[in-house]
Regions:
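Short, intrinsically disordered terminal segments enriched in charged and Pro/Gly residues
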Residues: 1-9, 40, 75-132, 173-182
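Short, extreme N-terminal segment that most often corresponds to the first beta-strand
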Residues: 1-25
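Flanking scaffold residues of small Cys/His-coordinated metal-binding clusters
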Residues: 9-13, 58-62, 133-137, 153-154
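Short recognition patches in nucleic-acid-associated and regulatory proteins
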Residues: 17-57, 75-78, 143-150
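Short cysteine-rich clusters marking metal-coordination/redox-active sites
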Residues: 18-21, 64-67, 139-143, 159-162
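Cysteine-rich micro-motifs
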Residues: 40-45, 57-70, 153-165
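Conserved binding-pocket/active-site segment within a compact domain
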Residues: 124-141, 147-151
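Eukaryotic Cys/His-coordinated zinc-binding finger proteins
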Residues: 143-152, 156-179
Length: 182
């Protein structure tokens, strides 16, 4: 049985990338990730029942942590994640096609002269490796969730789930201290 999920880091966060500013951040996996992956897979499967896939109206929009851009969940995949989902979908489609053709060979008593030969597909691709990059963990008090942001980012942030604005450094004020000679 094949399994498809977005790779997580050691703390359980999933990398996201903004389609507008191209910056990456991490969030906890969402209950909508499965629907988003199903919607993407359905687009690549030529024999999928598209009416059974999640629609854009059923999936919430998410926001970029940095620039506030709003988009559907499937827009937040990194290029590696997107390529992996496409590769996995095409591999699954080849396996389904093979099983449909191999059925004829298994039932040769009904048709002793098949006009084709089914060729076994390549094995399904391995899962993506876990994400190893460490980012700074910050609380989003609006939703009670945590996100991971770039260490260099100290400007205001936007909650990826609800779009609430948070001050730089997660609401803490920056204090500039200077030494004064006496």
């Amino acid at each position: 049985m094949a399994w498809l999920e977005l790779p997580r880091d050691k703390a359980g966060f999933v990398r996201r990338e903004c389609p507008r500013c191209q910056r990456s951040f991490k969030t906890r996996p969402s209950r909508h990730d499965a629907g988003m992956l199903q919607r993407l897979l359905a687009g690549y499967f030529p024999f999928e029942n598209l009416h059974e896939a999640y629609t854009a109206e059923e999936l919430p929009s998410w926001h970029c942590l940095y620039c506030g851009h709003r988009a559907l969940p499937d827009a937040w995949l990194t290029p590696d994640q997107s390529a992996h989902v496409e590769h996995m979908a095409r591999a699954w489609a080849n396996h389904v096609r093979y099983e449909q053709l191999a059925y004829v060979q298994r039932t040769l008593s009904h048709n002793p002269r098949p006009t084709f030969v089914s060729v076994a597909p390549e094995p399904l691709p391995r899962p993506l490796p876990p994400d190893e990059e460490e980012l700074r963990t910050l609380p989003m008090v609006c939703c009670g969730e945590e996100v991971q942001a770039s260490w260099e980012w100290d400007l205001p942030m936007v909650c990826p789930r609800c779009g609430a604005h948070h001050g730089g450094l997660s609401g803490r004020q920056q204090v500039h201290l200077e030494f004064v000679r006496e």
